[in-house]
Amino acid sequence: MSSERPVYPFAAIVGQEPLKLALLLNAINPQIGGLLIRGPKGTGKSTSVRALAGLLPEVSVVKGCYFNCSPSDPTNMCENCLATHRRDAKLPETHRRMRIVNLPIGATEDRVVGSLDIEQAIKLGIRALEPGILAEANQNVLYIDEVNLLPDHIVDMILDASASGWNTIEREGISIAHPSRFILVGTMNPEEGEL
């Protein structure tokens, strides 16, 4: 039995042609830069975004990499993958379909960017990082429902990562940069406030 909830099929969405076209174009060419969908409650914004998941292509990722690095592009690898690539030239890879990564409305800065893994620091005395949502979003779709309700500093961090394609985690004297290339899709209801 699957734990995933059923998703409404993209082809079953009636109307909303400009929205569907914009979603498809972003899936075809992620360098477009993302999409902001505005509309009143109940117009199918979230349903359309979630339905896109069934049409997303497969991507290659480095097996076991927390940051979903691409095994074939050294310019978009974390430090660990790049070091392994330089030594062995071939990274273990796996293939999977791109996913819709949801950003919760109450997400903290540490949850978005990444943080120090306190459990390992206390138990083992080592400084280990806990990857954030921007790591999970690499080579995926980052979906923000009600983006207009997010705190400005969280929006700024996401836009910085989206524009540069990189996220930097800086905590407790540790600094790690990793690729964070994603399709950014936000939805908002203008009745609840503007961006």
Language-model features and meaning:
Residues 2-195:
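Conserved ASCE/P-loop NTPase catalytic core
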